[in-house]
């Protein structure tokens, strides 16, 4: 099973955050910056990668993404 990444992108300090998962972090960040990533990132101008975690198994990355999305925002 291929590995995966959980990542967070933003548009600036105290800005909008996007949390995602991918098998190829470099290609995914490049796609977001070129406006080819998610519609949410394109709409909010999210081009800065601020956090990334690598996993040996994509299923572990997906589980981590789901857990992080349950975090409370403050």
Question: What spans do the regions from the language model cover?
Answer:
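GIY-YIG nuclease catalytic motif and its immediate N-terminal context
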Residues: 1-69, 74
